[in-house]
């Protein structure tokens, strides 16, 4: 055997690679054939009208007590990543997924957050329901409340968004709710951070990643008018039921157009690419600013993780959290928010 290997090492290596590639291609072909069967969900969104009365139980809540409250933001994990030939057919996605899981587990265990927010594009695969279930099981394993939003790629597979919403709603530690009908997508919901049962900060989780047609072209959806109306209704309702205005943050996948205006003045992080936003600006930033909004968080642009103040609002990118799909080693990890005892928000980028 040693003699054989010493004489023909290159042929042996090539043979091993060919066998491995053949096995991977066959396995992927089998999975692909299974993935052709469409999976439709039955997740039901709530009927909603701006004339409805807001009640405190409308929102999810997480109690902070009298301690600092830590929120870890992850985004664009892209499990399975079928976007490239190498990732899909040569099996590199499995290696990158495994590496990412190891680093994510380490990151979460070291940060010890009280809440985890996932900013969309968690999966990118034909069998998106299977991978979404695997991701939900992975997140539940930490026994920490977590709140996901959809990106523009999660539902690009055999399962529709309703099926994925079912999976998220049924996950044990997930706070996900399908939310109101008539919005852009599914998964518009609220998580109130409370102290002694009283909201001190509201987190708006918004699905702005649903594609739509603008001037005959497919583009990122953005925050539409119905979502803005719902946001204002909820902010007013929370203030009325709490007895005072409550500051809020919003988390979405696609950045609002104002991110394009940020150039060079960063509190932390950096810009590695342009901001790819919705084509149409429906005015959410201005409404957010006028309604006690303090921080906007987005994903989508993998090479950006900056935090910057723009017109009185912190525009923040969540840090890309995996080795799968386009990435830069300088912008991998997570973004940690700490709500101190006085309810001030401090941000920190945690690197892999």
Each predicted region: which residue ranges?
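Active-site-proximal beta-strand elements of phosphoester/diester hydrolases
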Residues: 69-84, 200-210, 251, 313-320
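N-terminal Sec-pathway targeting helices
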Residues: 1-24
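His/acidic metal-ligating clusters that form di-metal
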Residues: 111-114, 202-205, 217-305
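Extended active-site neighborhood of metal-dependent phosphoesterases/phosphodiesterases
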Residues: 39-63, 133-243, 335-338
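N-terminal active-site segment of His-dependent metallophosphoesterases
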Residues: 32-134
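Binuclear metal-dependent phosphoesterase catalytic core
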Residues: 27-61, 190-196, 284-287, 291, ...
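Active-site environment of divalent metal-dependent phosphoester hydrolases
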Residues: 80-83, 124-127, 148-160, 211-214, ...
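Divalent metal-coordination and catalytic microenvironments
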Residues: 76, 104, 116, 121, ...
